[in-house]
Amino acid sequence: MHQNEEKILAEFYGIISESKQHLFDTIAAERTKYLTVVLENIFQEHNASAVLRSCDCFGIQELNVIEKDNQYKVQRDIARGAGRWVDLYNFDKGQNPSLDCIQKLKEKGYKIVATTPHTNDVTINELDLSQPMALVFGTEGEGISQEIIAVADEFVKIPMYGFTESFNISVSVAITLNVLRNRLEESTINWKLSPEEQTALKIKWSKKILRAGNELEVAFRERLFQKD
């Protein structure tokens, strides 16, 4: 199966520039799903957009957005095109989108880490990285919902040394991802995407930069794998 996908990627690489090929290869090799970010009910567009950009910058491939009262919107000038490269999953259906999101992440094997002060919290430097984790961030005003706090596996905080009690959410995400990414880099944990995942991601990215990318993929598959 992977060989087939490699053939599809080779077809795309035959029509995109060598510089793009090199860029895709380099970035895909540093992408991760070991960490994923969850935004719950974020209402400020500039914060939501900045988080998307931070995910791309730190190699986080998946961003999960829970829309309860507020719709997730991206400001292009802030996101700087990050939405093309990061996989965005929206949870806005059903009676409780927050619990729907958490359940899906737990089914994928993620530990749920709530970024909120708690009697049992640890700092981002102390957080156990031995299991894939979903980092949940809430609004600056209300924070993370009680539904998520009740089912969270761990609680984490950023050390503070001033009078202000918290960072802006986009700053909190950037600091957290920076610290955890560096810790993963220094660890022996297998946190990178598998070769199969990297190939699939590079195919997806190739389609995004080409006009009629989806149609091209269909044509490649028909030509390469049609039955005799």
Q: Can you say where each PLM-predicted feature lies in the sequence?
A:
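Short amphipathic alpha-helical segments
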Residues: 50-51, 77, 125-126, 147-150, ...
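Active-site/ligand-binding-proximal alpha/beta "capping" segment
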Residues: 114-160
